[in-house]
């Protein structure tokens, strides 16, 4: 375990391979990751000052490379010392950089986010049971008694390299992050987390979690790190409101409706925000574009051939077809007043979909549903138009007389 507030690095590592070897593996992982992050602090400074897509990607890469280095080092030690052979560790970390954080994860340790009174799990267990549940080959009831419930499919150090999950998250004042080993979450249901958080002071939470796990069996090492994101009252209100607006707006867009909270967070990690002054064109009719826009605050007018057709307010979105191709925009969208929008670029979304295959399948299925709905609507409108035309043609001869 590591809590380094100066570096903004928080780690939980749960060693495997016997008590002594497991301790070596987890300690080696913590130290290697810390040293790599320390040597590359400039990457985090860049993200803090300017959270561009390039700086976000660099920070995610920093975390992934750090964990890969730890994996290679543990594997090397295990293969030079027969008493350590087969050792490894689960690993989860949160690296903070201003209003952004990067989660790195391998194994079955977890990160929970408590935001606005709700608990969200931001990691997915790398276990055989989790894979079977995802594939639908077992039920949750069967998982509870399965002989394979402790089988891990990924760990740091078992092989020379490992697949690392990374996730970039917003750090909003009032948020609470809980990093823990399976020694805790194995005795704790997700829906119990918020009541426990509300029932204890922040300083007492780790002890409260550990006592609960011990009371319920405590068969494994129990580790928990609790992190609270602070800010002044003004910043807290504004940042919380905007973070909530971004997530709520994303949930309402049909393209993202089947995604989990973790997957929606991944989409938000590739989104950017921008404020347009009143009267400024956001997209221009006839010009190519590749971004989806979501109105976070303010109003926009949709115009075609200089005529206003509609108005969108907070939560409205436009330009989604730009995610599919580079066709010219069919209308101009203009800010009616100072307006803040969230933008998702096609290439950034495609890169995310390449990394997250399940997310990609869900989005493609949603896109097919959207196209199907639009096709039905178009067919219905065409049918109505044909009927109206038939009536006009039938009446026309009599009108001429």
Question: Model-derived features: where do they sit?
Answer:
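A small-molecule sensor/coupling module
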Residues: 264, 349-389
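Short alpha-helix capping/helix-loop boundary micro-motifs
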Residues: 162-165, 288, 305
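PP2C/PPM-type serine/threonine phosphatase catalytic domain
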Residues: 1-276, 296, 327, 368-369, ...
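Cyclic-nucleotide recognition modules
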Residues: 310-365
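Conserved short histidine dyad/triad with adjacent acidic residue
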Residues: 260, 272-287, 311-314
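Phosphate-/nucleic-acid-contacting segments
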Residues: 385-401
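Glycine- and acidic-residue-biased ligand/ion/polar-headgroup-sensing regions
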Residues: 279, 290-305, 314-316
């Amino acid at each position: 375990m590591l809590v380094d507030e100066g570096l903004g690095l928080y780690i939980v590592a749960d060693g495997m391979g016997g008590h002594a070897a497991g301790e070596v593996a987890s300690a080696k992982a913590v130290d290697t990751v810390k040293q790599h992050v320390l040597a590359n602090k400039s990457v985090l400074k860049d993200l803090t000052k300017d959270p561009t897509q390039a700086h976000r990607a660099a920070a995610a890469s920093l975390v992934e490379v750090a964990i890969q280095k730890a994996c290679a080092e543990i594997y090397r030690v295990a293969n030079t010392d027969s008493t350590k052979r087969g050792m490894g560790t689960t690993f989860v970390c949160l690296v903070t950089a201003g209003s952004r954080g990067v989660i790195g994860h391998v194994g079955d340790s977890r990160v929970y986010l408590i935001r606005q009174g709700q608990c969200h799990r931001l990691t997915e267990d790398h276990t055989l049971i989790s894979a079977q549940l995802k594939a639908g080959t077992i039920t949750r009831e069967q998982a509870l008694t399965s002989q394979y419930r402790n089988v891990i499919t990924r760990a740091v150090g078992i092989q020379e390299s490992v697949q690392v999950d990374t996730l970039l998250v917003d750090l909003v004042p009032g948020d609470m992050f809980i990093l823990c080993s399976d020694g805790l979450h194995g005795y704790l249901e997700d829906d119990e987390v918020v009541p426990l958080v509300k029932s204890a002071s922040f300083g007492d939470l780790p002890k409260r979690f550990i006592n609960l796990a011990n009371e319920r069996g405590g068969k494994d090492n129990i580790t928990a790190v609790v992190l609270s994101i602070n800010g002044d009252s003004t910043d807290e209100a504004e940042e919380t409101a905007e973070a909530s607006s971004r997530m709520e707006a994303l949930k309402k867009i049909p393209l993202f409706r089947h995604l989990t909270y973790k997957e929606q967070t991944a989409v938000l990690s590739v989104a950017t925000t921008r404020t347009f002054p009143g009267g400024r064109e956001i997209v221009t009719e006839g010009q190519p574009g590749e971004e989806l826009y979501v109105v976070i605050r303010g109003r926009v007018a949709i115009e075609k051939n200089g005529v206003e057709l509609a108005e969108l307010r907070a939560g409205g979105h436009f330009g989604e077809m730009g995610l599919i191709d580079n066709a010219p925009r069919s209308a101009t969208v203009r800010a009616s007043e100072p307006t803040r929008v969230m933008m998702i670029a096609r290439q950034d979304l495609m890169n995310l979909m390449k990394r997250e295959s399940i997310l990609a399948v869900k989005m493609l299925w949603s896109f097919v549903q959207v196209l199907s709905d639009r096709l039905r609507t178009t067919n219905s409108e065409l049918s109505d138009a044909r009927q109206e035309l038939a009536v006009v043609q039938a009446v026309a001869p009599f009108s001429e007389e």
